[in-house]
Regions:
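Short beta-strand "acidic-cap" motif of Rossmann-like dinucleotide-binding folds
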Residues: 44-49, 144-145, 166, 245
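Adenine nucleotide phosphate-binding catalytic loops in nucleotide-utilizing enzymes
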Residues: 16-20, 25-27, 80-81, 198-205, ...
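Residue-level detector of alpha-helix initiation sites
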Residues: 29, 123-127, 269
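N-terminal leader/targeting and accessory segments in enzymes
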Residues: 1-103, 107, 284
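Phosphate-binding loop of NTP-binding sites
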Residues: 20-21, 36-39, 69-74, 81-221, ...
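Short alpha-helical "patches" and their helix-cap loops
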Residues: 51, 167, 285-289
Length: 289
């Protein structure tokens, strides 16, 4: 059996992904990175609706038979973002064990307490993440760009205490997350999207706002100041974090001394507004932006 130092996590006690029996459902990039990360830390089993297509022998030997899943008692189930709990082969099993479902973001948070900027929203996530990453890199931060942008968060290597993360998070990832926290959270905008997955607009909005729900006092959330769906949700709930409303239409106040043409294009003005507000909170060197 595995033996690791017990690690306490503020708010949730001991690390819940050490020395456990874990099922990873979905063998795309996210699922495979979770397997590689956890395989020497816990007893990990794999399943995918299309597992018969898997050729890698190291992966195949960890795949559990469909029938054996129902005979097993798992401590945690890590669900890949692409798995729709209502349409997959293990739908009934997952609904019965909903309290055991976690995301790769949760696994990351259990092992690392690094500062993160986590960006979500209906539009502009990738552009804003890339821009934030470039700015931090230019200012000599040890920074990783991960998440829905294409690099699974658990595939990050050479992580130090000072490593800073820029994370693109989709509603699918956040929907399954339970314990993940980010010191800096960003909701760029919200409009009806992925309703075929979330079933209702309200559930889609709630998934996005999980990012703020788990934040603590001393954390910061940046949101579009005139977004109707965002403001409605803010009125309905109280959050421990400090809410910073970003005026995306008054970009001129940020650009007085900026010559970078990227910031001046209309398409990037809204994204740039968020980046400037976050940079201000991080006390970044304005000359280098």
């Amino acid at each position: 059996w595995f033996s690791y130092t017990k690690t306490k996590i503020k708010g949730i006690g001991l690390n819940i992904f050490l020395n456990k029996k874990i099922l990873i459902y979905g063998l795309g990039k996210s699922g495979l990175s979770a397997f590689k990360f956890l395989k020497n830390k816990s007893d990990v089993f794999l399943y995918d609706d299309y597992h018969l297509k898997i050729q890698n022998l190291n992966i195949k030997k960890s795949i559990i038979n469909y029938k054996n899943i129902f005979k097993s008692e798992f401590d945690q189930i890590i669900l890949s973002p692409g798995i729709d709990i209502n349409k997959c082969k293990l739908s009934k099993f997952l609904k019965k064990n909903n309290n055991k479902i976690y995301s790769d973001l949760d696994v990351f948070y259990s092992f690392y307490k690094n500062d993160c900027i986590t960006i979500t929203g209906t539009n502009g996530k990738s552009t804003t993440c890339q821009l934030m990453y470039e700015i931090l890199s230019n200012q000599k931060f040890d920074v990783k760009l991960v998440g829905n942008i294409g690099n699974p968060i658990l595939s990050a290597r050479n992580i130090k205490k000072r490593t800073f993360f820029v994370i693109e998070a989709s509603s699918y990832q956040l929907e399954y997350s339970k314990i993940f926290r980010s010191k800096y959270a960003v909701i760029l905008n919200l409009s009806p999207d992925h309703i075929e997955r979330h079933k209702t607009l309200n559930k889609y909005v709630k998934a996005k706002f999980k990012l703020l729900k788990n934040q603590l006092k001393g954390h910061f959330a940046f949101v579009k100041h005139d977004d109707l769906l965002i403001n409605k949700e803010l009125k309905l709930n109280k959050f421990a974090c400090k809410i910073i409303k970003v005026d995306t239409k008054n970009i001129d106040k940020y650009l007085k001394n900026t010559k970078n043409e990227f910031f001046l294009t209309e398409t990037n003005q809204a994204n740039s507004s968020f980046v400037f507000e976050i940079s201000k909170k991080l006390n970044l060197n304005k000359v280098l932006i």
